[in-house]
């Protein structure tokens, strides 16, 4: 009988979480949703010195923003210490683990001798009990580590969903330390107990964990557990071809929100960063879940491309509801000194966003473009001298008069502009640039007729006439 699918995301809360990290949450989340399974969030916080609540909060916030909801958790390893100690005691009792009194200095010296002899550095089993073997006398006052009694012969084999069949000889593995002298369990041991207790069927994680896998499988087999399906994802590289990391300039997940990216764009981009469905580039979350499978995970490192993410974000911004974008733009407007009170004095923000979004790649850019509608214009003096010339001023006066009488629609404003151009024998840039400067304070705006309609008749006419007075 096939076990119900149970996947997990098991981050260590030791600081920074970037797109490469969160991809290891996206894929198991998608697989669990596709298979109508369970997605578990486990916080691997046994590294007490480096773990922090701030880092946990960053993980939770990033997952929530991207819509990666979990069915169980967060489960904290530090809250499961009694369970780990229980399993350690059982392993000691069954001879699956043993105390080792070799000091760190002795182990270093052993490894140095092995290196000098051209051998692979490894623990030599000095304290491993064997039939007929006489063990050294335990040194007084020394607390031992606990080591797992790894098989001496045979091969660890698993069919990795990404890497294919992997075989590691047990002769390559030494007896892994599974508990420190103070009794606290080691990462590789905790992971096995957790995966076994939580019934994890599929482990989808970065390939930096490949070397841990044979050790974890051996411990799992010793405990009578059933190994999950493993899928080790190739590394995510930054734009310079280095492994993505904070040290190499990676942005945190929430920094993308703060830069004005939409979560659906980031999810779409992340989905393609190591998985594919034919040539499909743009797809919804629902399509991604429907299409996702382990067979189409990439086998080569994926390289981050910021311009591709920006292109996707621009697409999703164009598709997004104006009211939603308006709410998302407010914090960016506030950072520009434009609060709700200022917004209330200008045109409807939904309408402004609707005009600006076709030119934007981020919500931040929408806000920067929208700001002109809620500020008193302060055009550059040199720009005024360049565009509001004596040749243009009569046309501006006539345009103001025409706009006073025109219907306030885009079509009517466009007709007034064209009629003024014809009367004064000007080209559109000559008139449009000066109008943009006087009304909006900048020469960079969308279509002039659409911009003027949003500013409103009174504002447009008043600002043009004030400049001519």
UniProtKB/Swiss-Prot annotation:
Name the record gives this protein: Glutamate--tRNA ligase
UniProt keywords, alphabetically: Aminoacyl-tRNA synthetase, ATP-binding, Cytoplasm, Ligase, Nucleotide-binding, Protein biosynthesis
Disulfide bonds: none
Short sequence motif 'KMSKS' region: positions: 243-247
Underlying gene: gltX
Cited NCBIfam families: gltX_bact (TIGR00464)
Chain ranges for the short sequence motif 'HIGH' region as given in the UniProt record: 11-21
Organism: Burkholderia orbicola (strain AU 1054)
Catalysed reaction equations from the record: tRNA(Glu) + L-glutamate + ATP = L-glutamyl-tRNA(Glu) + AMP + diphosphate
Superkingdom in the source lineage: Bacteria
Cellular location(s): Cytoplasm
Lineage: Bacteria, Pseudomonadati, Pseudomonadota, Betaproteobacteria, Burkholderiales
GO biological process: glutamyl-tRNA aminoacylation
């Amino acid at each position: 009988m096939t076990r119900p699918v149970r996947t997990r995301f098991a981050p260590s809360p030791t600081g920074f979480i970037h797109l490469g990290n969160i991809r290891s949450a996206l894929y198991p989340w998608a697989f669990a949703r596709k298979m109508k399974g369970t997605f578990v969030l486990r916080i691997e916080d046994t590294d007490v010195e480096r773990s922090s609540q701030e880092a946990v909060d960053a993980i939770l916030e990033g997952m929530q923003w991207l819509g990666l909801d979990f069915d169980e958790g967060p489960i904290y390893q530090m809250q499961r210490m009694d369970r780990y100690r229980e399993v350690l005691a059982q392993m000691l009792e069954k001879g699956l683990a043993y105390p080792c009194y070799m000091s760190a200095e002795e182990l270093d010296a052993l490894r140095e001798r092995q290196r000098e002899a051209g051998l692979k550095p490894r623990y030599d089993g000095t304290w491993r009990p064997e039939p007929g073997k006489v063990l050294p006398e335990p040194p007084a006052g020394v607390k031992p580590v606990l080591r797992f009694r790894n098989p001496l012969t045979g091969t660890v084999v698993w069919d990795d969903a990404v890497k294919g069949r992997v075989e590691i000889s047990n002769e390559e593995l030494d007896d892994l330390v599974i508990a420190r002298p103070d009794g606290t369990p080691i990462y590789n041991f905790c992971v096995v107990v957790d995966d076994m207790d939580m019934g994890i069927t599929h482990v989808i994680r970065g390939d930096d964990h490949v070397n841990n896998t044979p050790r974890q499988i051996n411990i799992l087999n010793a405990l009578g557990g059933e190994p999950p399906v493993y899928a080790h994802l190739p590394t995510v590289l930054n734009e310079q071809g280095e492994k993505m990391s904070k040290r190499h300039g990676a942005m945190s997940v929430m920094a993308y929100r703060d830069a004005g990216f939409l979560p659906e764009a980031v999810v779409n981009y992340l989905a393609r960063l190591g998985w594919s469905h034919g040539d499909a580039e743009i797809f919804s979350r629902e399509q991604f879940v429907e299409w996702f499978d382990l067979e189409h995970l990439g086998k080569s490192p994926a390289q981050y491309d910021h311009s591709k993410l920006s292109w996707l974000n621009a697409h999703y911004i164009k598709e997004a509801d104006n009211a939603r974008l308006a709410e998302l733009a407010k914090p960016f407007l506030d950072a520009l000194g434009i609060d709700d009170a200022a917004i209330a004095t200008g045109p409807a923000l939904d309408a402004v966003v609707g005009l600006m979004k076709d030119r934007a790649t981020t919500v931040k850019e929408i806000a920067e473009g929208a700001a002109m509608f809620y500020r008193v214009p302060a055009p550059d003096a040199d720009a005024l001298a360049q565009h509001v010339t004596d040749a243009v001023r009569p046309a501006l006066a006539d345009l103001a008069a025409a706009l006073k009488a025109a219907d306030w629609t885009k079509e009517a404003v466009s007709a007034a502009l064209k009629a003024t151009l014809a009367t004064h024998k000007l080209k559109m840039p000559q008139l449009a640039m000066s109008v943009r400067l006087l009304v909006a304070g900048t020469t960079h705006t969308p279509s002039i007729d659409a911009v003027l309609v949003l500013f409103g008749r009174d504002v447009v006419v008043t600002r043009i006439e004030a400049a001519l007075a």
